[in-house]
Structures are given as C-alpha cells and as structure tokens.
Amino acid sequence: MNAYNKADSFSLESDSIKDVIHDYICWLSMTDEMRPSIGNVFKAMETFKIDAVRYYDGNIYDLAKDINAMSFDSFIRSLQNISSKKDKLTVYGTMGLLSIVVDINKGCDISNIKFAAGIIILMEYIFDDTDMSHLKVALYRRIQRRDDVDR
C-alpha cells in the first residue's frame, strides 16, 4: 500500500487511478490508530465522500450500511443497489459512497481485509473505463485546487 498514501502529487500521464483507489481503500480499511498520515492525493480522495452526501437525497450512511461484499449473494445485491442509484449519485458520489462503506467497516482483523477486497472487486464491476477517466481527472483537479489554496 504505501505508494500513494503520502503522495502530494498525481500525474495524469503516468499515475494509475486504479492503483490510487486500491491503496486508498486499503488505507480506509485500517483502524484510525493504525492509519499512517496522508498526503494530498488521499486528502483529495476524501473529498469524494462529500460528493456522496451532496448527491444522494436520503441518508448516505443508511445506504452505506446496506452495502456488503462478504458473500456472493450480498455482493450481487450490493452491486444491483448501487447500480440502480448510480445516476443519482454520479461517479464521484459512488466513489464517495464506497469509501464511506469501507470507513464504516474498518478494522484490523481478516474480515475487514476481505471486506475491503470485496469493495475493490465491486468497484471493478461498477466503474467502466469512462468512469475511471472521470475519477482520474477529478482527482488531479482536486489536488491542483488544494495546491492553489495552500500557496
């Protein structure tokens, strides 16, 4: 995991959004005490949670509690649930929703690691290449905006 958690910059040409997301989900799955400090890349990833709250009409945390990737049946139900709301959430809100799901279920035992892995696999089904491109550009812009504010 340590490739992006402390990173302050992100390149559209050479960095992989999938790698960032995988590292970020692994970082989120840790307890707060175990999480290493983060740089601007993960700080920008955290802003997708705001999108989830903004784009979803109801209580995003209630929806997040219904997402489960621990069994095949619950994985399929979760996939259907998210896919049916994807137009309302947008790709940014969906990224934020899945981040909230992992954050709610964080911990240091093996079931939390399996849960995070299940969410990463769920993302592979939910996000297509266009979605990944949108996330990549959005992440880049959010980091740039943060840099502009910090100057």
Swiss-Prot record:
Pfam families per the UniProt record, alphabetical: Poxv_Bcl-2-like (PF06227)
Induction details: Expressed in the early phase of the viral replicative cycle.
Source organism superkingdom: Viruses
InterPro entries: Poxvirus_Bcl-2-like (IPR022819), Poxvirus_sf (IPR043018)
Key word NAD present: no
Family: Belongs to the orthopoxvirus OPG029 family.
Subunit structure: Interacts with host TANK, TBKBP1 and AZI2; these interactions prevent interferon production. Interacts with host STAT2.
The name this protein goes by in its record: IFN signaling evasion protein OPG029
